[in-house]
Amino acid sequence: MNSAGADEIGKLFVGGLDWSTTQETLRSYFSQYGEVVDCVIMKDKTTNQSRGFGFVKFKDPNCVGTVLASRPHTLDGRNIDPKPCTPRGMQPERTRPKEGWQKGPRSDSSKSNKIFVGGIPHNCGETELREYFKKFGVVTEVVMIYDAEKQRPRGFGFITFEDEQSVDQAVNMHFHDIMGKKVEVKRAEPRDSKNQAPGQPGASQWGSRVAPSAANGWAGQPPPTWQQGYGPQGMWVPAGQAIGGYGPPPAGRGAPPPPPPFTSYIVSTPPGGFPPPQGFPQGYGAPPQFSFGYGPPPPPPDQFAPPGVPPPPATPGAAPLAFPPPPSQAAPDMSKPPTAQPDFPYGQYGYGQDLSGFGQGFSDPSQQPPSYGGPSVPGSGGPPAGGSGFGRGQNHNVQGFHPYRR
């Protein structure tokens, strides 16, 4: 016996060790069965952690039998599995582990009573195979392999006899004539999966693949950007409902383009160069209710509209806060240079009405006297000024206010 074989005598392989088990605890446990001359736990070279197994060598080889007879063994709360280490030269030759049954030449180390039958006619069943092969001996089992998807024979199978002599007689005739077709017969070599032959249902280790729910790659429902419109200030709007001038996004692949910026509303200026008042006094939560021109007043502003954006026009084709010309007169000639006086009275533009949002109204100087405490302007047609006003004292030399006087 060589030195390698002598080194294996009296050695035990110990598997199932706990990660916390050390060489000292392993030696201490097996010392109760005899003198331990060597003890090692195999560790990972990178992490230096236990790999869960090790080796124990006794001085007396007979201690190995004592350990094996004292099963089960528990160390650090786990059941360990000690096995004797057999020298490599003394290990019996084993065939390579395989799966299922395989046709092939006869092997003395793996004899069986099963034969492989290939090329079986499509109209031949298990009954016909049993009737044919029973002339070689007692048939104990007939297995035909079927397609798992189509559920029809694949053209080969296995026959099991009661004794090995029947197998030898069937294999001596390499080709057999069954129902007018030449069939090949070989000895079947056993594999690990003896209870299940290849091709039977359930033999595949891969599950069926799930087909996608949509051929174009979209599964379930379209992207969320296709399902809602654009609302002001982040409001959610159901699909298909237009709000704020934006309709539902266009159909097609990909996400819809971003919405355009809000369109600015143009406020026209009346002839004469006098612009309309702009801005609102502080402390007001809503813009004043203007009533320019003819017709009913515009609807109240949308409280959900974005800040700084005027409400939509009350009538189609007219912009908010615009100053349309009176319907009774023709539109002014814009080719003429501006003059100091307007072409028509102020009242037709709505300046004589109450602008409650500003705290005071704009009056027509040709119809109402100024309210600044000065004397009335000759020809104005108004009553004399009162004794109190906004001026500094009762100075009769102060002329009345006129919006176009500089």
From Swiss-Prot:
PANTHER family: RNA-BINDING PROTEIN MUSASHI HOMOLOG RBP6 (PTHR48032), RRM DOMAIN-CONTAINING PROTEIN (PTHR48032:SF18). Pfam families: RRM_1 (PF00076). Interacts with DAZ and DAZL. This is DAZ-associated protein 1. Mainly expressed in testis. Expressed at much lower level in liver, heart and brain. Also expressed in ovary. Expressed throughout testes development, in both the prenatal and postnatal periods. It comes from Mus musculus (Mouse). The modification N-acetylmethionine is found at M1. Residues 91-111 have a biased composition (Basic and acidic residues). GO terms for biological process: cell differentiation; fibroblast proliferation; maternal placenta development; positive regulation of mRNA splicing, via spliceosome; spermatogenesis. Residues 195-207 have a biased composition (Polar residues). One of its GO terms (molecular function) is poly(U) RNA binding. PROSITE patterns: RRM. Residues 74-117, 186-406 are annotated as: Disordered. The modification N6-acetyllysine is found at K150.
